[in-house]
């Protein structure tokens, strides 16, 4: 009976790790045909944001420049001009296909992530008892560590998250999350998030040391500051 009680939280933890991957895979497959059909029948009513409109205009300006170039080379044979028109037509069709695939990818991934969040939230509420047991295990494990190891772990974690080289890591993490939701890449938004998110974390961490660690374990705070200096 005791082994079963100990095994249940571990099984719940493993399900929390693999459940998002399974949800993403299954819903991507099941929603793909529906989203594709919906986009192909309703795309004329979809509002494009400024970035999408800019990308579309840039592509069509390139095609317009090619057409102007065509007007400048009238002396070429009719066969050559006909091939040029066919090439422009094919490029236009290819561009429209790429645009449709990008929009379908955005809608599909955003919908899947929302569904995944809702399911995981409900699953966490349903498994509240297992989460309490896992939390008690984690607290017991941390309590048994020495203050030196705790201080070293905190220092390592803070250097990774808010250290000198952390913006490069945050750029990759935020960029991957941004891409996973299917949003259009925007350097200004990513740069703003990368420059502000570590600062917010640093402020919260210092507040946590001031309010919690100073009260619970003053010796740990002393060791941490000694190692940090």
UniProtKB/Swiss-Prot annotation:
GO CC annotation, single: chloroplast inner membrane
Residue intervals passing through the bilayer: 7-27, 114-134, 189-209
One GO term (biological process): potassium ion transport
Membrane topology according to the record: Multi-pass membrane protein
Pfam family, one: CemA
Principal location class: plastid
Entry keyword annotation includes Ribonucleoprotein: no
Annotated InterPro entries: CemA
Catalyzed reactions: K(+)(in) + H(+)(out) = K(+)(out) + H(+)(in)
Example of a GO MF term: proton transmembrane transporter activity
Compartments where located: Plastid, Chloroplast inner membrane
Alphabetical keyword list: Antiport, Chloroplast, Hydrogen ion transport, Ion transport, Membrane, Plastid, Plastid inner membrane, Potassium, Potassium transport, Transmembrane, Transmembrane helix, Transport
Domain of life per record: Eukaryota
Function description: Contributes to K(+)/H(+) antiport activity by supporting proton efflux to control proton extrusion and homeostasis in chloroplasts in a light-dependent manner to modulate photosynthesis. Prevents excessive induction of non-photochemical quenching (NPQ) under continuous-light conditions. Indirectly promotes efficient inorganic carbon uptake into chloroplasts.
Family: Belongs to the CemA family.
Protein's UniProt name: Potassium/proton antiporter CemA
Top-level taxonomy: Eukaryota, Viridiplantae, Streptophyta, Embryophyta, Tracheophyta
């Amino acid at each position: 009976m005791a082994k079963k009680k100990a095994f249940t939280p571990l099984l719940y933890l493993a399900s929390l790790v693999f459940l998002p991957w399974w949800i993403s895979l299954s819903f991507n497959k099941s929603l793909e045909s529906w989203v594709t059909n919906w986009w192909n029948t309703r795309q004329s009513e979809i509002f494009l944001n400024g970035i999408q409109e800019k990308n579309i205009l840039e592509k069509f300006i390139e095609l317009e420049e090619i057409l102007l170039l065509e007007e400048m080379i009238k002396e070429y044979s009719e066969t050559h001009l006909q091939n040029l028109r066919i090439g422009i037509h094919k490029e236009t069709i290819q561009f429209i296909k790429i645009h449709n695939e990008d929009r379908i990818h955005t809608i599909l991934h955003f919908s899947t992530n929302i569904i995944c969040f809702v399911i995981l939230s409900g699953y966490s509420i349903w498994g509240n008892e297992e989460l309490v047991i896992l939390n008690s295990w984690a607290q017991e494990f941390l309590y048994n560590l020495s203050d030196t190891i705790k201080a070293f772990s905190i220092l390592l974690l803070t250097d990774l998250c808010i250290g000198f080289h952390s913006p490069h890591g945050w750029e990759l993490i935020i960029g991957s999350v941004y891409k996973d939701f299917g949003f259009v890449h925007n350097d200004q938004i990513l740069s703003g998030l990368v420059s502000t998110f570590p600062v917010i974390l640093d402020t919260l961490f210092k507040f946590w040391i001031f309010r919690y660690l100073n009260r619970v374990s003053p010796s740990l705070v002393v060791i941490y500051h000694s190692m940090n200096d």
